[in-house]
Amino acid sequence: DRIAPREPIGVLFSGGVDSGSVFLTLYSLLLARGETPARLKAFTLSVGGDSADADQAARFLDQLGLGLFLEPIEVTLEGIDYQEAIRVIEDYKPLDVQSASMALALCRGIRSRYPDWHYLVDGDGGDENLKDYPLEDSHNLTIRSVLNNTLLYQEGWGVDAIKHSLTYSG
């Protein structure tokens, strides 16, 4: 309700469970509101023309007949700057630095292509909150094992962040 009906909305999109859920939720909400989903884009990063995420993103959307929403952002390997990521996130955890390095490169690419774009949505972090994918390899995955994982420091997740119940950390 706070975004004007003509403003474009971008999703940082890998085609995984997190970004896929975010994209499909936004797509569904726009349709339910009678608004055009044409304002929605699924931005995916492709480094040096070779990207497992870009391939996965294309497969995800193509299987749903939504491939027209995908917009790959190409960058060179030199366009990935882990030192900038460390400065921005003030963190040294390897997975956080990797994630931030890619997100910054993707955002720079989007800004270069669309200098007036204002709204981006991201589903990053779900893998960490579920102790990583694929789920079939996580035989001990339960809600309790997730909540007791003290490594879930991101976004206030983790057992110390429980505010209301064992299944909602809102």
Predicted features along the sequence, with ranges:
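ATP-dependent adenylate-handling active sites, centered on carboxylate activation for C-N bond formation
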Residues: 1-170
